[in-house]
Each structure stands twice: as C-alpha cells, then as structure tokens.
C-alpha cells in the first residue's frame, strides 16, 4: 500500500480527533528526537563530528516539526492553521522555526523583522555588506552539514560541505523540544492544553514576549499532573519552556523569497559606482 504524506488530512477530522492525532504525532517525534540525540552524543564521544553534525541537522528539523504541530493546535483560525501542513514538509520554514526559537525576541514585531533576512534565497555580505553573494544562510548551513558538493563561489570553484569546522548547527530548538517532552507536553494531553490556553489569544506586532510566557505557564499547569513534585531537572525544563516557547508563527510567510543574482549584482555595481565614482567614466 502506498504511504503518502498526508498531514493535511488532519483537517478532515473533527477537532477532538485532530488533537488526538497531533498528540500521537508529538509522541512519535519526541521519541525519535530523543533517540537521535543519544546517537549524536555517542558519535561526539567517538570524535565523529561530521556524522554527528549530519544527525544534528536532521534532529533540528524534526524538532521544528514538533513546534509546528503545537502551533497548529495553538492557532484557531483554521485557514491559517492549515499553513502548518505546508511548513511541516518544507526545509526553510522548519529552519526558520528553529532559528526563531533559538533567539529571544522581545515582541512579535521582532520576529516579523527576522524574516527580512531569514527568507531571501540569496543575499549580499562582506566587509562592505556587498562584497559577496551568498545563498540563504539557513539552507546553506543545512546542506554543508549533510552533503559534500562542488560549488561556484566568488573565489572560484571548490568542494564544500562535510567539514564540521565549516558549519555550526544550533541546538536550542532541540533542547526546548526535549524539555517539552520531559514536561509532558508532547502528548495528547499537552496538545489539548496548548489548544485551550491559546483559544481566545490575540496578539500583534507590539505584543511582548511575556504574553507567551504566561500562556506557556497555563499549558504546563494543565499538562502536568496536579500531584507532580517538581525535581530540579523538571524546574530547569519548565524555566526553559517559559523562556523560549514563543508566539505561533503560522500567520507569517516563512517560504523562501526568491532573489535573483542579477538583482544582487546590480546592487554591487551601484555600490562601486558610488564608492569609486565609476559613473564619471561613462
């Protein structure tokens, strides 16, 4: 029997069944991420940094899928929530999810601002901010961790990727998701708690991060059994969740923004014209 990717099918289910299906998915992902992390730690102990980096890249995107599923439960406008199914299967939206949750945005507007530099397919950088043309940094880092390739650069053609000294995989989103697992959020009960806490939540560009912290506290109080005696490690997990679990992102456009090489080269030429007065020769 053909097994096709069908996350969109959850929107054909009644709300109660949908939350149950999401809870099941959260549990599967949580277990998978935990196992990946155990393998990563074993590889690092053996000094196999390249293999560990490749698994870290996979683990990061699996962690982002957890955050996307939770956002589907936290987003009650179904038209917006459905976007989560597209983001669930796309590399860049998943990487943006991970990047946002590794930062400390003061408000929702700051997250909106992040997208101006996280989404473009190519960008200019260098000592003068226009010296070199780079591919999207998030995608480039992912590919360098997973693949070896022969690429054209401003310095000519060269082999890239596979060298752990040439890339860094941010693990903050994975740490957050594992904390959520230990706190009982990656369950059907956790999915229902998230949905209930955010049911009438409204926010805009000026909404402060403390709004998310208070909502996260509501979710934790509903998800954890009332007789839970918090250990020191659980307190650490709760603190991390309260600090790092930010706004739902499904209302934002997280897809790659195409930027042509011609456009960037024109910007380089304009800079050179202004800087060195080359216009005077024409």
Language-model region placement:
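Amphipathic, well-ordered alpha-helical segments in soluble domains
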Residues: 32-36, 62, 141
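Conserved small-residue packing positions in alpha-helical repeats and bundles
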Residues: 40, 64, 143-145
């Amino acid at each position: 029997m053909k097994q096709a990717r069908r996350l969109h099918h959850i929107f054909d289910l009644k709300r109660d069944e949908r939350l149950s299906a999401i809870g099941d998915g959260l549990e599967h992902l949580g277990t998978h991420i935990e196992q990946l992390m155990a393998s990563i730690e074993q590889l690092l102990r053996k000094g196999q940094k390249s293999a560990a980096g490749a698994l870290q890249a996979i683990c990061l995107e699996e962690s982002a899928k957890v955050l996307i599923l939770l956002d589907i439960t936290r987003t009650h406008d179904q038209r917006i929530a459905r976007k989560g199914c597209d983001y669930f299967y796309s590399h860049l939206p998943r990487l943006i999810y991970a990047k946002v949750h590794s930062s400390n945005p003061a408000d929702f507007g700051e997250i909106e601002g992040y997208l101006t530099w996280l989404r473009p397919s190519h960008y200019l950088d260098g000592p003068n901010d226009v010296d070199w043309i780079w591919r999207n940094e998030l995608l480039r880092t992912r590919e360098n961790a997973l693949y070896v390739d022969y690429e054209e650069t401003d310095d000519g053609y060269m082999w890239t990727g596979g060298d752990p000294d040439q890339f860094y995989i941010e693990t903050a989103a994975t740490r957050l998701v594992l904390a959520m697992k230990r706190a009982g959020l990656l369950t059907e009960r956790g999915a229902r708690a998230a949905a209930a806490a955010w049911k009438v939540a409204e926010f805009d560009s000026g909404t402060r991060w403390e709004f998310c912290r208070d909502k996260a506290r509501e979710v934790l109080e509903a998800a954890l059994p009332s007789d839970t005696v918090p250990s020191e490690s659980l307190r650490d997990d709760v603190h991390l969740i309260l600090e790092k679990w930010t706004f739902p992102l499904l209302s934002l456009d997280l897809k790659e923004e195409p930027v042509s090489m011609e456009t960037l080269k024109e910007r380089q030429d304009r800079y050179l014209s202004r800087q060195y007065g080359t216009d005077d020769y024409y």
